[in-house]
UniProtKB/Swiss-Prot annotation:
It comes from Janthinobacterium sp. (strain Marseille) (Minibacterium massiliensis). Belongs to the LipB family. One of its GO terms (molecular function) is lipoyl(octanoyl) transferase activity. Keywords: Acyltransferase, Cytoplasm, Transferase. This is Octanoyltransferase.
């Protein structure tokens, strides 16, 4: 099987979650075997999203922030200003004829891209078995979650949804939910850890790492 081409990177800017969600599904409905893979960089206004495994009781008090049901995997999470969100619109059959065999490798590639992006800012992070996402591995914030991921993989091997990385956020809304279904799970962002950067810089860094990783 030939090496897949690098996905196209599109910057969608600040966009309501419902708009992006509808656009991802429409793109995936319309794509053909010739459609290029794409990575969408987005920043969302405040929103809580529920994955297919979500227990609505994990939204403790939404404080008038919209709560949107989605078709991604996983539990409840929060998106808001100052967070990098990258959606991966991919055809996994370009990597393996049986797309299901590539799904775990895809998650590993996403997680490693986040780990490598954070390492460039001297932030040490790690995976946790059975708990998708990226967590701080040392220091005062050890164990705090800094990135979340959730995907939809259709039966034809096409994916959407993706990964979020906290850069410079108001983290308070995370205390109004059980993030990813875990009670009292601490969350953190790069700014709180002393990283000197901008949202745009991290958006580009993570998108480029993902694009390169997915073309290997």
């Amino acid at each position: 099987m030939s090496v897949p081409q690098q996905p196209l990177i599109l910057q969608r800017g600040l966009e309501a979650y419902e708009t992006t969600f509808a656009a991802m599904r429409a793109f995936t409905d319309a794509r053909t075997a010739a459609t290029a893979d794409e990575l969408w960089i987005v920043e969302h206004p405040p929103v809580f999203t529920l994955g297919l495994a979500a227990d609505p009781s994990h939204v403790l008090d939404p404080h008038q922030i919209p709560v949107v049901e989605t078709d991604r995997g996983g539990e409840v999470t929060y998106h808001g200003p100052g967070q990098v969100v990258i959606y991966l619109l991919l055809d996994l059959r370009r990597h393996k004829a049986d797309a299901r065999l590539f799904a775990r490798e895809l998650v590993n590639k996403i997680e490693q891209s986040v780990i490598d992006t954070l390492a460039a800012y001297n932030l040490a992070c790690e995976r946790k078995p059975g708990a998708p996402g990226i967590y701080m591995s040392d220091g005062p914030a050890q164990g705090a979650k800094i990135a979340a991921l959730g995907l939809k993989i259709r039966g034809n091997g096409c994916t959407y949804h993706g990964v979020s990385l906290n850069v410079a956020m108001d983290l308070t809304p995370f205390t109004w939910i059980n993030p990813c279904g875990y009670e009292d799970l601490a969350t953190i962002d790069m700014q709180s850890l002393g990283a000197q950067t901008t949202l745009a810089e991290v958006q580009n860094a993570l998108a480029n790492r993902l694009s390169t990783s997915l073309s290997r």
